[in-house]
Amino acid sequence: MKIRLDQYLVQHGLIQSRERAKAMIMSGVVFVNEQKVDKAGEMIKEDAKVEVRGHDIGYVSRGGLKLEKAMQCFPLTPNGKVCMDIGASTGGFTDCMLQNGAVKVYAVDVGYGQLAWKLRTDERVVNMERTNIRSVTPDQLGEPIEFFSVDVSFISLHHIFPVAQAITTPDAMGVCLVKPQFESGREKVGKNGVVRDPATHCEVLHNAMGYAAANGFSVRGLDFSPVKGPEGNIEYLMFVQKSAEPAVLDDSVAKQVVEASHSTLDH
């Protein structure tokens, strides 16, 4: 079975809209089976290898698309706020924050030399590379964080929320990427590190909401990331806000989001 290339890009979460997909295809950054394709209506096989190369997605990395979707789905904005990008890597979230009005972004990552040059040289960015978020203190920052994002690997959100609680303002908002492959027991992680079972995804979201609430954050929204993880894992966006009376969403909401993610991203 074949599908239009622009449709494929949207259905598989590589690009947010058909309009943007068409523009990017025409700009020559979309490759199918290692061959550049510049016609949006090109019919391709469902199992084709499709890549978007370069930075024409509008951000230095695909992380920007994740935060972009969160801002479309949830009532949140980094505009006018002091922000933190936890697990910054290349800086997709940082880039998106700046493009949406952030006054300052602390870009935190344990790695070194990954942050895009345009962000390293931006005076609004505080590059905190070689930094484990678990060691960051309020005194080290000197000011509270008003908006934060979390996109970390090989560590559970269970370890992130206590720090987020300590360094943020009383009404801080955040977007956390929930990754089943790093929140599940080893016995539930399948071949190539991929967690496919929807029931496990529901369990992971239930636990993640619990971690948030236990550290003073209400869970105000859930949706799925428009971009799969590197190995093909479906990941989720969790919108949290600090609260004196933390509350979580009903598990039925998580189940609906999981079902929607699989029907949209798994073909």
Annotate each predicted stretch with a short phrase.
Residues 79-89:
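Conserved class I S-adenosyl-L-methionine
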Residues 91-92, 113:
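Glycine-rich SAM-binding Motif I of class I
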Residues 96-104:
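Conserved S-adenosyl-L-methionine
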Residues 180-197:
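Short, glycine-/aromatic-enriched active-site segment of Class I SAM-dependent methyltransferases
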Residues 1-48, 82-83:
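A basic, amphipathic helix-loop patch mediating RNA/tRNA/ribosome contacts
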Residues 158-175:
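A short glycine-rich, Lys/Arg-flanked "PGG" loop and its adjoining helix->strand segment in the class I
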Residues 106-159:
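S-adenosyl-L-methionine
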Residues 234-267:
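Flexible, glycine-/basic-rich loop-and-beta segments that form/coincide
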